[in-house]
Amino acid sequence: MLRNALLALLMTLSASSFAQKQTKVQIVSDGKPLVSILISPKASPADKTAASMLQEYIQKISGCRLSITEKVDPPANFIAIWEAEERTKQKESLINDGYIISTSNQNVFIESGGGKGSIYGVVELLERYLGCRMYAPGVEVIPHSASLSIPPMYHVDNPANSFRVVHGNFTDDTLYRDWQRLNSIDEMFAKGYYVHTFNKLVPWETYFTTHPEYYSLMNGKRIKDQLCLTNEDVYQIVVKKLKAEMALQPDKKVWSVSQNDNFSYCHCDKCMKIINEEGSPAGPIIRFVNRLAAEFPEKVISTLAYQFSRPAPKVTKPLPNVQIMLCTIELNRSKPMDQDSTSRSFVKDIADWGKIASNIYLWDYTVNFSHSTSPFPNLHVLQPNLQFLTKNGAHQHFQQSNTGVGHEMSELKSYLISRLLWKPDINADSVISDFVNGYFEDAAPYIQQYIDRLSSEIKKTGEWLDIYGHPVSHASTFLSASNIAFYNSLFDKAEEAVKAKPEILSRVKVYRLPIQYAAIEIGKNDMFGPRGFYIESNRTFELRPEMNQLVEDFYQVCKDNNVSPLNESGLKPEEYYNATKRFIDVQVEGNLAFRKTVIAQPLPAVKYGEGNLALLTNGVKGANDYKAHWLGWEAKDFTLTLDLGSLDNAKDISISTLYDPKSWILHPSSVTCLVSSDGKKFREIGKLTVTGDQKNEDVTHDFLFTNPSGKIRFVKFSIAGTKALPAWHPSAGGDSWVFVDEIVVR
């Protein structure tokens, strides 16, 4: 009754009287409260959170704690927080998460369109009118004033996108999410049913042995990778499973029925007939999930349009309660999608899906998965990409940014993307400037120059920017020696500017990590070159002290700032440091295998290290990245034979392998070492095995053997691949790789 009476009174004010007679609303004067925070007796959880947030931050600013009440006796003034009436929503086209902030008769009204609109209205009030900021979890700017007032206003704001996720560690923080107007996955999706759910619904461990026909037919053979979606038993199993799971989570509306993370879709006659009719492997998927959507009309069935299933079907339209999760994983990140010739197929695909689907959930990628701490200059494409996606009907967004301390410009990118998700047409440069000035204070001019230089350098070339790319790919462009030197000069000045402010200095040092990381990785790629770790002269090798110190400095900053894993595979700074120290400990002097010839049977995959067998004896041990200094074999056994060139008294023999399960790379099952004096008759000197399921292994493993006696010329390694990914792996049963590097003989 109170709320309705107040609203009725306010509606008697004309728009002109509002403009002419309103004055600023004083809420605190000399530390004394002049208003209360008014909520409805039936306030939603969001309204209560909004009221508490406003109370907390006004106290932080002014030292005055406003009371929260459900009743105000005239003539007392108030800040009201509640859901707008239906007629107000219709008049202002107010939608879920939207809000109105208005003033009238020395009162302030924050009216929600539903959802978290009241929280976001409070955030707007704190940011725009009271000067507060939250740049990262725990990093706030709070001005201090004993008196506070709000100018007269009538401000309506709605989100351009109805669901907004920026993935990463930062958004695990609820308060940070609220300040950035973001959602969490759990707000929409059933727990355990977000993506890649085929195996959860029809686990191969349960069914494959007795019913291989439930799974993909590839090259005439049934494999575990995907489901056969034209098999009626598969459909019935999925229906039964979903009914049981939905009973456990009755409040959850969106359920993912989506392909596993591989390319092995079914090629049986029935599936191929549909694929040919639809012109896309998405055909069987959409027909399958449409049946489920009809079976569960009160739920939403989410499915992927990803990699092989990205092109839209030509015949079948998704039902209204089917969500299309469209992914951009293949695209170049240096140019806006709609302006890049290499992205034309995606531009066509999103247009095609937009013609047949009303519920598109866009999964975009704004991070380098393999080298999250390396420079990844994509700030200039974030706004045009989100503008393009939103204009093409994608209003639910998952931005996979993998935000964490130490990831390249992580705090800035999360801050900018959040605001672009709410309003894609904001002034992005102003947002960047606001962040840089608030986060870096006196160091801001130099950080801004660094950002500008990175962007201008990649715009010059328009080179491919890959979400799995290695810094070496850009060693002659934005990561050239001259550019790295310029960036370092800026960071030197930035550190000097804030040397008396330890907290700000730490932020500057963390933002310098990507430049240090790139220099280390580029140096590792050419150990004996001009940017490498060693100076070579007459077969002697001297470690450059400045490069060694660079590794130490990088690791120290990581430790001091609790830097999160350095890539998607969870590489810890300590592991990276140890692997790098191992890497730069070149195996040259006393190494009989250095630059000697190796033959392989069969040959390694040419897409890694160009299949160059000389990498196995170049004196450099591979580190954590399979794309640098490693050679790979997929799902097979192989042999490597080293020719020392002449008979020698070899005693200790070793070979190294890599472990990166997210990239489907495991250590081999076993390595057998054999030696020979003539290359014809070999004798075994040892066999080493890797036991267990390889769920947790060291990143690198050295297989060490001892030759008990006699001169040898040839060394042969017989390596048994693991071949199939183990049961614990998300792509269990898929082909696994073995990656091998440095052979050392002493």
Model feature map: region roles:
Residues 1-23:
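Bacterial Sec-dependent N-terminal signal peptides
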Residues 302-330, 373-380, 406-414:
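Substrate-binding cleft/loops of secretory-pathway carbohydrate-active enzymes
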Residues 621-686, 699-746:
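Aromatic, loop-rich ligand-recognition surfaces of beta-strand-rich domains
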Residues 50-53, 57, 88, 92-287, ...:
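Feature activates predominantly on carbohydrate-active enzymes
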Residues 233-236, 244, 344-445, 449:
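Structured mid-domain segments that build the active-site/substrate or prosthetic-cofactor binding neighborhood
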Residues 420-601:
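Catalytic domains of carbohydrate-active enzymes that cleave complex glycans
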Residues 23, 306-315, 340-352, 383-384:
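Alpha-helical scaffolding within the catalytic cores
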Residues 17-100, 146-154:
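Acidic, contiguous N-terminal accessory segments
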